């Protein structure tokens, strides 16, 4: 008999639509329940009422005695063909944390949730894993169940008396959910275990001791069965999974089946999982319900997994360790670790199909960026008015966008200094701290374009046109110059930086200046063309040399840049 329970929880594994059009974050927890007659004793203010399902099996509707009425259940058909009751338990009913909840790991295997503080365990024995919704959990081989209201019991032959069998074996089919739970995790009992199940594990068998709310202890034995009973039959695969559902999801990687399709406008993108579709839909709606709680950080994200990854930019946590002996590197996400491992194995699974190319890549991102070299596609567009620059890579757009803002997203983990570009941060760490460790660019996943009015606000640009002078290049006091070839291939432009007062003192001739933000003297960029014309562009603190080139180019073409530049 299965008890299927759904809890509203901010860290839920799935979402079901609720009343009022709002989505409810829920978790689905399947456990076995002990039946004694037609109802069960009250446990921590909750009671269970037996209900016979359509297939003849028995399920239980959980009843919160404080409400004075039963919470209505709903029959659902599970992926493996079985049926169970689902019920919504409000978050305040002290059942929001469910131990024994089955979740799918990134490799397709099943783990069972136990809520506890990671800091209470030896960190060397804690392994980070990524769940299917992108969040990170930690595996420990000896954990303590903290909940005092966990419903965890088994049913044999329909009565409690059937449990008093001593050394007798229990049919695994009648206790499948609990047996899987025991086969996966061993739990060390301790003080304050209350009414929880205490499970001790040996190599040959699983010995389980069930502690009910009234204190009766029912020792039993259950033979350990195969943990992964569902095998992939595709040639060359043979992967094993604990449930039919997880096998079915895995098989989509062979078949290419993507049953979840986006119906927003003309999008029609399809996904292998409902969670993937839900995350994608938020790119259309702009919904970002997961907000960073760090002080002075206003970023929010489409998924809880993205938020969790972002938080590590504040904490510096790198829970995913490279398993290769002697490497010692660790990473903020399991995907970055997976790509890193390929530097040890030499694996490059992504091959370019362009005739005559033959290049292969370790990561899907690098492969996609490479393909755009052949196609000429530049899908990433700068949203700042008047810019309209396009890029083949998202990382290039991210790096470009900081020229429009005061943002300095890269911070030194040694001294706290912040930088606009990751290359500048890397140079600082090498020279100031002798740190040559490569810097991950995963922060780029959390780039949120700044609104155009925020970019325009505070912009101070002055440009001077029509400055006559000798052919050639005017050098700065430091003598630094940069040559640039125009698009026509003939007009050589030299870029020279000097301050505005020096420019006025050294040059004579008609000048036309436009000050958009103030009269203060700021450094300018002087561009001298081969035809004798020179253009000086004064840029604000948030502008860059790249912006100066763009503005000067428009001036040389006869345009008059306005505020939108």
Curated annotation (Swiss-Prot):
Assign the protein's first listed, main location to one coarse class. Answer: nucleus
Q: Where are the zinc fingers (C2H2-type)?
A: 230-254, 260-284, 290-314, 320-344, 350-374, 380-404, 410-433
Question: Membrane-crossing residues?
Answer: none
Q: Which InterPro entries match?
A: Znf_C2H2_sf, Znf_C2H2_type
Spell out the Pfam families in the cross-references.
Answer: zf-C2H2 (PF00096)
The answer to whether the entry has keyword Zinc-finger is yes
Query: Which keywords accompany this UniProt record?
Result: Activator, DNA-binding, Metal-binding, Nucleus, Repeat, Transcription, Transcription regulation, Zinc, Zinc-finger
- What does the entry list under GO cellular component? nucleus
Q: Which Gene Ontology MF annotations are present? A: DNA-binding transcription factor activity, RNA polymerase II-specific; RNA polymerase II cis-regulatory region sequence-specific DNA binding; zinc ion binding
Any idea where this protein resides?
A: Nucleus
A Gene Ontology BP annotation from the UniProt entry? regulation of transcription by RNA polymerase II
Role according to the record: Transcriptional activator. Activates the gene for selenocysteine tRNA (tRNAsec). Binds to the activator element (AE) motif of the selenocysteine tRNA gene promoter.
Similarity annotation: Belongs to the GLI C2H2-type zinc-finger protein family.
**Stated name of the protein:** Zinc finger protein 143
Q: Which gene encodes it?
A: znf143
């Amino acid at each position: 008999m299965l008890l299927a329970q759904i809890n509203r929880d901010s860290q839920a594994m799935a979402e079901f639509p609720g009343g009022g059009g709002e989505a409810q974050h829920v978790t689905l927890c399947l456990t076995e329940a002990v039946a004694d007659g037609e109802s069960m004793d009250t446990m921590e203010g909750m009671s269970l009422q037996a209900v016979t399902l359509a297939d003849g099996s028995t399920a239980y509707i959980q009843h919160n005695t404080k409400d004075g009425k039963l919470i209505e259940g709903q029959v659902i058909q599970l992926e493996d063909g079985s049926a169970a009751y689902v019920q919504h338990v409000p978050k305040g009913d002290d059942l929001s944390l469910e131990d024994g909840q089955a979740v799918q790991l990134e490799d397709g295997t099943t783990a069972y949730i136990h809520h506890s503080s990671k800091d209470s365990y030896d960190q060397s024995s804690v392994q980070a894993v990524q769940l299917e919704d992108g969040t990170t959990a930690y595996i420990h081989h000896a954990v303590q169940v903290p909940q005092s209201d966990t419903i965890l019991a088994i049913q044999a032959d329909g009565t409690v008396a059937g449990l008093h069998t001593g050394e007798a074996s229990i049919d695994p089919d009648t206790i499948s959910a609990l047996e899987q739970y025991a086969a996966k995790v061993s739990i060390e009992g301790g003080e304050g275990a209350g009414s929880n199940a205490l499970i001790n594990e040996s190599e040959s068998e699983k010995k389980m001791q069930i502690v009910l709310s009234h204190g009766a202890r029912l020792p039993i034995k259950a033979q350990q069965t195969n943990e992964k009973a569902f095998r992939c039959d595709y040639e060359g695969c043979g992967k094993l999974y604990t449930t039919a559902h997880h096998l079915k999801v895995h098989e989509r990687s062979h078949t290419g089946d993507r049953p979840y399709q986006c119906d927003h406008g003309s999008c029609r993108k399809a996904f292998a999982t409902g969670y993937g579709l839900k995350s994608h839909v938020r790119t259309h709606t702009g919904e970002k319900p997961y907000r960073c709680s760090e002080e002075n950080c206003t970023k929010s994200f489409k998924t809880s997994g993205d938020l969790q990854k972002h938080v590590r930019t504040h904490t510096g946590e790198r829970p995913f360790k490279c398993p290769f002996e002697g490497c010692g590197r660790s990473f903020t996400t399991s995907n970055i670790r997976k790509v890193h491992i390929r530097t040890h194995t030499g694996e490059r699974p992504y091959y370019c199909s362009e005739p005559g190319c033959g290049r292969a890549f370790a990561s899907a991102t690098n492969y996609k960026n490479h393909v755009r070299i052949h196609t000429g596609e530049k899908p990433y567009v700068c949203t700042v008015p008047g810019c309209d620059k396009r890029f083949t890579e998202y990382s290039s757009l991210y790096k470009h966008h900081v020229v429009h803002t005061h943002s300095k997203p890269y911070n030194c983990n040694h001294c706290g200094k912040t930088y606009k570009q990751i290359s500048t941060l890397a140079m600082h760490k090498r020279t100031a701290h002798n740190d040559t460790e490569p810097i991950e660019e995963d922060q780029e996943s959390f780039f949120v374009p700044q609104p155009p009015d925020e970019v325009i606000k505070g912009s101070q640009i002055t440009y001077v046109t029509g400055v006559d002078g000798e052919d050639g290049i005017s050098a700065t006091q430091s003598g630094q110059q940069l040559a640039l070839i125009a698009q026509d291939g003939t007009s050589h432009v030299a870029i020279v930086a000097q301050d505005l007062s020096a420019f006025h003192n050294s040059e004579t001739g008609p000048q036309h200046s436009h000050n958009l933000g103030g009269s203060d003297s700021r450094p300018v960029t002087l561009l001298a063309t081969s035809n004798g014309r020179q253009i000086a562009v004064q840029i604000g603190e948030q502008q860059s040399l790249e912006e100066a080139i763009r503005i000067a180019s428009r001036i040389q073409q006869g345009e008059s840049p306005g505020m939108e530049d």
